[in-house]
């Protein structure tokens, strides 16, 4: 038997809670070997056990299993009925079996495959041999890693037509053997919802990580070399793109250089050294003009606002940190060196301090261009880096940050002009072929001093502009200044002697600026503090920057002409400058120099307020733009172009708070944003003239000129103090010049940069507010007459509207002095209360007489209440209490009226009351409708009266409770039973009553009638006493009905027999035990009548006996006379027979039912 045993899993249900595993094991062990018992208890939400069952693994034979189930199934055990079944197989057990079966199947298949290979003579795909061993007997089959046998393949190369031989044994070292056991179960706890994946873009997108959007990369256009080439720096065309190809040709360097010079704003704001990495590229000015022409269009197409925003943000971070020592080796890729290739460390660090990294491509002409470690191989790289770092430590970071800010400001102005002049210079250079590294550096210097304003912001643009500056443009610019013609030898001498200029160059990034600064110093040194510095050499970077700043302030007049010429060039963000031919450029430069001279003279006598007002005009970008086609091109943009110009002017004159909403908004972000946006806004059509553009710009700025005057007066910048030197001949030219001077002065006050930025933001907000208020004023004036209500009492709340008085005041302020006062006023308006209404204005406009007039709503007692209520709200005009809030006559006032009755009225009322009392006593009538007016008035209901429980007078409104406790049902039932009890009648009483029945009946009749008339409340009260007072009368009435009919009118007893219905007893009150005459049986009425006549003559003893017999209760008693006629409704003679037949039938039915039940039981028994 044991051999046939199988392991079965049984389900045992219906267990009680106190059954243990041991109990189950003992119970089932007699049928087989119990290997495992598992008891499971299901509980409800409260933890109470609901169902208990068990699984038992038992090794048992089939016969024993049947026996076990037949014996134990449906049996009761410890309070539960067992239910035994074969349980479903455990899924773990089934899984193990499936795996074993799969494993066995797999083994069979492998053996089958091996046999098949042997039969067919195929290759054994698993051989133990060194990878690369050829399979004997099979050509081009080799053993690879893990003993796999793979064929040698001949594959076509993807990029070439050549077919290569692929030996798998030589490319198999990255193969991994994958384990066969895939059944490693991962616990649920280690599962995750995260999608694992690499860093490829699809995996990142699946995880929800999206990279920042980057515009398409700059296109680099190849330009053919020109015969003459000067060093041009290849700048990274975009902030995030680093040029990583050292073997770039000179052409490519030049074209990169030109790309950046055209779009200087892109690279300029990026302080990160990576963006400015310049590889070892030789300096060349290869076909610059053609490169510019191409790039001006192509680069502009790929430019995006996102890039601009990125660059602006980076430049802002740079301004905040102003840490020049960060990545010095990379951040200053260019070093200015002398002929002996010794680095001018001070220059490097002036660059570093300004945060101008590789952007300063324009190096001092005095010093040779000292290339960065990566850019220049002739210098010792380690030495250069060391020198840079040492100087960085020496310099004062604070000074540099200030200078950086100031130079950034000026850079915007010079960008446009420098760009144009740069372009011309490039053309000139190509003709002259006299470009060398030194001369290139000097020209960059010359250009820098006018573009000194563009130094920090245009640092990168300067580096881009460093490519080439032509002598012709330089001569044209210097025509109006103290003219100094410099040869290369002179420039070399200057590089050795005057180190200040190189520093200026490095700062300003405009190559032309530095030479011009020198000339400016020579010519106008008496004006400016630069004269102080000129005498000695500036070695330390801080000194260099300071001297540069001072020189720039005083020489602003000279610089501005250049700046005006240069600005179009910088401004040509979209390559506008490249659209024109060389000849037109040169002519325009000459004319612009002449007009610049006029600007200088006019500036000396110009009034600062006029200048500040005019700064908003478009000429900030280039006052001489009339002659310059580049400027015309810029101005052709129309109103769009006004914004950049305004931006620059406002930035230059920091006093001004608002030029136009658009410009001020853009300005508030960062100075860099202005030139960038200005460049972006340039259109490529270049035929519009300055006159038309001036009109537009002046129109746009007219709104804010007055406010600009005020702010320029209050700003207190040194530039404004110096500006009175300028004359107001040409307002447009003055604007640019004055903006330069302001930017120079802003260098002096660089520490207040953040405060000024905030002021600019406020100015932008003010401009917007002003525009809104102008609209509001128009709407207000248009709608002023539509409001019919008087001004002193508005019927509706006006949200956020300003009254006419306020608008008039603001308009007068705007006209007279719209400065800080206007700002404060507008701020006050914007921060006003939510419910500002014209009440505020009317309160100011009210006369004192109206203000102190006695208001009728505050008179009297109700007025006093209203006054107290008003005092809670204070002077808040939103909660003014007027006559609408007065209460109507209150209860107290009514009482006062009652108190004011005259004595005569009171006496009259008393007399009336007495007369009424007399009438009531005589007639015994309760007159409830008294004519007392006071009581009527007091009882009259008024909606306005509010019940106040604290007031004694209000007690009249309270409903008084009945003092009598409500009787419970039990008490009422008890009373009813007591009333039903038959009273004990004494013979004396009966005797007395029998003597005078008529009197008794009369009294009962009277009382019954009276009781009928009395209300229910009184009736209840009189119920008990009457019972007690006259029990004999009641019983006698019950006993001898006396023949009178129950009615409200006197009825004689004579009518007894005529009346069909009569009442035996008179109801005294509502006596419960009295029977209802209607319930009496009609069949017994005649008997009663006869009985009555007999009873009247009977003796008292008989009467008592009869009374006991005839007392009737509501329920029937045995032998009740009322049931005598019921026999008629019963079955007659055959009733006994029917009963017997019914009983016989029922017994038969019972017998049949029992028989069927027994038969069914017998059938159900198992055979």
UniProtKB/Swiss-Prot annotation:
Phosphoserine modifications at: 268, 298, 304, 331, 365, 378, 432, 723, 801, 837-838, 843, 845, 890, 1036, 1082-1084, 1099
Phosphothreonine found at: 302, 381, 795, 888
Acidic residues composition-biased segments: 457-470, 837-847
Modification after translation, per record: Phosphorylated.
Subcellular location: Nucleus, Nucleolus
Principal location: nucleus
Coiled coil: 753-779, 886-924
Cited InterPro entries: NOP8_RRM, Nucleotide-bd_a/b_plait_sf, RBD_domain_sf, RRM_dom
Described purpose of this protein according to its UniProt entry: Plays an essential role in the survival of diffuse-type gastric cancer cells. Acts as a nucleolar anchoring protein for DDX47. May be involved in regulation of gene expression at the post-transcriptional level or in ribosome biogenesis in cancer cells.
Record-given protein name: Nucleolar protein 8
Organism from which the protein derives: Homo sapiens
């Amino acid at each position: 038997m044991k051999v046939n045993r199988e392991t079965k899993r049984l389900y045992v249900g219906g267990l009680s809670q106190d059954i243990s595993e041991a109990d189950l094991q003992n119970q089932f062990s007699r049928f087989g070997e119990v290997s495992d018992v598992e008891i499971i208890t299901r509980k409800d939400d409260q933890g109470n056990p609901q169902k208990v069952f068990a699984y038992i693994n038992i090794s048992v034979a089939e016969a024993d299993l049947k026996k076990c189930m037949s014996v134990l199934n449906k049996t009761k055990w410890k309070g539960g009925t067992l239910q035994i079944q074969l349980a479903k197989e455990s899924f773990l057990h089934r899984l193990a079996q499936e795996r074993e079966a799969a494993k066995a199947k797999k083994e069979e298949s492998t053996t089958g495959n091996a046999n098949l290979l042997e039969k067919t003579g195929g290759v054994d795909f698993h051989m133990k041999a060194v990878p690369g061993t050829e399979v004997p007997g099979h050509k081009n089959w080799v053993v690879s890693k893990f003993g796999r046998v793979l064929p040698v393949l001949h594959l076509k190369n993807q990029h070439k037509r050549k077919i290569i031989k692929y030996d798998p044994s030589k490319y198999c070292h990255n193969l991994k053997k994958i384990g066969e056991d895939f059944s490693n179960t991962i616990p649920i706890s280690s599962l995750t919802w995260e999608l694992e994946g690499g860093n490829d873009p699809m995996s990142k997108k699946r995880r929800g990580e999206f990279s920042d959007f980057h515009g398409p990369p700059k296109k680099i256009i190849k330009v053919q070399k020109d015969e003459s080439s000067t060093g041009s720096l290849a700048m990274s065309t975009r902030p995030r793109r680093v040029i990583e190809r050292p073997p770039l040709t000179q052409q490519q360097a030049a074209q990169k250089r030109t790309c950046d010079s055209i779009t200087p704003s892109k690279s300029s704001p990026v302080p990160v050294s990576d963006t400015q990495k310049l590889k070892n590229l030789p300096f060349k000015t290869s076909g610059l003009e053609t490169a510019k022409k191409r790039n001006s269009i192509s680069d502009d197409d790929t430019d995006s606002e996102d890039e601009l925003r990125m660059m602006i943000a980076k430049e802002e971070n740079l301004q905040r940190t102003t840490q020049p020592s960060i990545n010095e080796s990379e951040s200053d890729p260019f070093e200015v060196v002398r002929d002996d290739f010794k680095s001018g460390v001070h220059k490097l660090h002036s660059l570093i301090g300004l945060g101008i990294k590789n952007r300063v491509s324009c190096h001092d002409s005095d010093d040779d261009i000292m290339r960065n470690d990566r850019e220049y191989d002739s210098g010792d790289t380690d030495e250069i880096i060391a020198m840079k770092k040492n100087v960085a430590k020496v310099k004062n970071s604070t000074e540099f940050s200030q200078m950086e800010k100031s130079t950034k400001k000026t850079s915007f102005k010079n960008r446009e002009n420098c760009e144009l002049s740069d372009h011309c210079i490039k053309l000139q250079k190509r003709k002259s072929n006299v470009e060398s590294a030194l001369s290139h550096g000097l020209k960059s210097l010359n250009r820098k001093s006018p573009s000194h304003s563009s130094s920090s912001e245009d640092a990168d643009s300067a580096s881009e502009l460093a490519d080439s500056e032509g002598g012709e443009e330089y001569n044209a610019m210097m025509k109006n200044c103290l003219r100094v013609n410099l040869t290369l030898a002179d420039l070399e001498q200057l590089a050795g002697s005057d180190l200040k200029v190189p520093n200026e160059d490095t700062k300003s990034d405009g190559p032309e600026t530095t030479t011009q600064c020198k000339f400016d110093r020579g010519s106008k040194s008496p004006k400016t503090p630069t004269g102080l510095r000129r005498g000695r050499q500036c070695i330390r970077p801080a000194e260099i920057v300071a001297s540069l700043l001072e020189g720039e302030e005083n020489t602003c007049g000279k610089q501005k002409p250049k700046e005006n010429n240069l600005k179009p060039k910088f401004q040509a963000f979209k390559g506008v400058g490249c659209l024109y031919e060389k000849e037109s450029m040169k002519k325009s430069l000459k004319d612009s120099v002449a007009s610049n001279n006029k600007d200088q003279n006019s500036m000396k006598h110009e009034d600062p307020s006029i200048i500040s007002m005019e700064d908003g005009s478009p000429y900030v970008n280039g006052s001489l733009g009339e002659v310059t086609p580049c400027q015309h091109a810029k101005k052709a943009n129309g109103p769009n172009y006004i914004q950049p110009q305004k931006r620059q002017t406002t930035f230059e004159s920091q006093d001004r708070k608002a030029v136009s909403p658009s410009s001020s908004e853009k300005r508030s972000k960062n100075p860099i944003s202005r030139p960038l946006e200005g460049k972006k806004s340039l259109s490529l059509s270049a035929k519009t003239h300055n006159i038309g553009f001036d009109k537009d710009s002046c129109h746009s700025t007219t709104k804010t000129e007055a406010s600009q005057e005020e702010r320029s007066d209050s700003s207190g910048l040194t530039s404004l103090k110096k500006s009175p030197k300028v004359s107001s001949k040409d307002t447009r030219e003055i604007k640019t010049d004055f903006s330069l001077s302001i930017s120079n002065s802003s260098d002096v006050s660089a520490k207040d940069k953040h405060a000024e930025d905030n002021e600019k933001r406020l100015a932008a907000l003010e401009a917007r507010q002003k525009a809104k208020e102008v609209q509001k004023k128009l709407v207000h004036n248009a709608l002023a007459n539509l409001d019919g209500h008087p001004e002193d009492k508005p019927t509706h709340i006006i949200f956020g509207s300003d009254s006419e008085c306020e608008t008039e005041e603001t308009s007068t302020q705007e006209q007279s002095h719209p400065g800080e006062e206007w700002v404060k006023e507008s701020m006050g308006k914007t921060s006003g209360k939510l419910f500002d209404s014209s009440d505020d204005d009317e309160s100011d406009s009210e006369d004192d007489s109206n203000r102190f007039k006695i208001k009728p709503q505050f008179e009297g007692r109700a007025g006093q209440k209203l006054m107290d209520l008003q005092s809670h709200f204070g002077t808040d005009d939103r909660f003014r209490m007027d006559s609408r809030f007065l209460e109507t006559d209150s209860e107290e006032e009514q009482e006062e009226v009652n108190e004011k009755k005259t004595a005569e009225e009171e006496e009259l009322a008393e007399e009336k009351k007495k007369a009424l009392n007399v009438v009531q006593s005589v007639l015994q009538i309760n007159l409830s409708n008294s004519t007392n007016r006071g009581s009527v008035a007091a009882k009259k209901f008024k909606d306005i009266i509010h019940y106040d429980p604290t007031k004694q007078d209000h007690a009249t409104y309270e409903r008084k409770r009945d003092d009598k406790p409500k009787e419970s049902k039990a008490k009422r039932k008890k009373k009813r039973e007591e009333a039903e009890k038959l009273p004990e009648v004494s013979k004396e009483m009966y005797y007395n009553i029998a003597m005078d029945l008529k009197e008794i009946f009369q009294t009962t009749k009277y009382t019954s009638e009276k009781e009928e008339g009395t209300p229910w409340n009184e009736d209840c009260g009189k119920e008990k006493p009457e019972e007690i007072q006259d029990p004999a009368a009641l019983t006698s009435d019950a006993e001898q009905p006396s023949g009178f009919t129950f009615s409200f009118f006197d009825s004689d007893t004579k009518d007894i027999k005529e009346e069909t219905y009569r009442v035996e007893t008179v109801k005294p009150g509502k006596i419960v035990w009295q029977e209802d005459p209607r319930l009496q049986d009609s069949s017994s009425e005649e008997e009663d009548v006869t009985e009555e006549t007999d009873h009247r003559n009977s003796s008292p003893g008989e009467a008592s006996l009869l009374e006991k017999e005839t007392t009737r209760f509501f329920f029937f008693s045995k032998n009740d006379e009322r049931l005598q006629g019921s026999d008629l409704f019963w079955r007659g003679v055959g009733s006994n027979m029917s009963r017997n037949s019914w009983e016989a039938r029922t017994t038969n039915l019972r017998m049949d039912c029992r028989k069927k039940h027994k038969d069914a039981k017998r059938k159900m028994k198992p055979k």
